[in-house]
């Protein structure tokens, strides 16, 4: 490259480019045949065509119940979450207004009035089941509930527990990170496990601060400080969570989850 003798420029002339260093252009020796079959391997505007899709959108879980039913799980949401009451939903009414959007989530009521939604596990994210999904699948709300609880049961059967002991105090937690740790408390088998492990030592306190954590501990007679420490932990964990659920402390009483009334409530 040499400096341009005309001056006024910081860039010199590129004689190699001026003289041409590209391949010789292809010159047609005949007119194009517009009726000839298109070469599938020919470049398009200098690029290769995109690959053909391997599946149809109609086969996605959002459209195909046979694919969705093995991917549906329940999930807790904070109190105040709005949606379509799954127990009162009328499929015929939804179908009569099928041209309208029914994007509100199907909403169930869990223990201690905790809202429950249903989600499709899509791997890196979840899809919350709504009224449009119900219409697309052509199933009853009870089918969604049954499938979700069945999938949760199968997962929980092999999911591990974290067991922590400090002196006479003991915590049993589910913190696998799979996304179904908190909602695991819906399963009778889980309630029975906590009863067997923690009831002999005292009352059973339970926290559901966020989606990825369910923790339970024994409140022993005379250890009132444990209840305070447990409550502080739940509030702190829920406050720093990406998907918080509830800051309350619950108690397992007669096989039911109820709001903890304090250390003197059952004395």
Where would I find each of the regions flagged by the language model?
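Extended, low-hydrophobicity segments enriched in charged/polar residues
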Residues: 12-166
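A contiguous, surface-oriented mixed alpha/beta subdomain in the mid-to-C-terminal portion of proteins
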Residues: 97-252, 257-263, 267
């Amino acid at each position: 490259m040499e400096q341009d003798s005309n001056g006024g420029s910081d860039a010199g002339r590129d004689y190699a480019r001026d003289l041409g260093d590209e391949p010789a252009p292809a010159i047609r020796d005949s007119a194009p045949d517009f009726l000839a079959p298109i070469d599938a391997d020919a470049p398009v505007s200098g690029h290769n065509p995109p690959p053909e899709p391997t599946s149809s959108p109609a086969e996605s879980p959002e459209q195909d119940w046979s694919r969705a039913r093995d991917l549906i799980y329940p999930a807790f949401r904070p109190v105040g979450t709005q949606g379509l009451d799954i127990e009162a939903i009328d499929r015929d009414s939804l179908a009569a207004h099928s041209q309208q959007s029914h994007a509100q989530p199907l909403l169930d009521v869990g223990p201690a009035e905790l809202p429950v939604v249903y989600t499709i596990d899509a791997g890196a994210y979840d899809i919350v089941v709504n009224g449009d999904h119900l219409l697309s699948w052509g199933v009853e709300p009870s089918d969604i509930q049954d499938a979700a609880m069945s999938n949760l049961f199968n997962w929980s059967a092999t999911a591990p527990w974290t067991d922590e002991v400090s002196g006479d105090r003991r915590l049993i937690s589910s913190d696998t990170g799979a996304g179904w740790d908190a909602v695991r408390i819906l399963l009778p088998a889980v309630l029975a496990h906590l009863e067997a492990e923690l009831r002999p030592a005292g009352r059973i306190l339970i926290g559901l601060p966020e989606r990825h954590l369910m923790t339970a501990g024994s409140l022993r007679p005379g250890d009132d400080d444990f209840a305070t420490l447990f409550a502080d932990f739940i509030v702190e964990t829920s406050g720093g969570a990406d998907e918080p659920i509830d800051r309350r402390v619950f108690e397992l009483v007669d096989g039911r989850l109820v709001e903890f009334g304090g250390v003197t409530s059952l004395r």
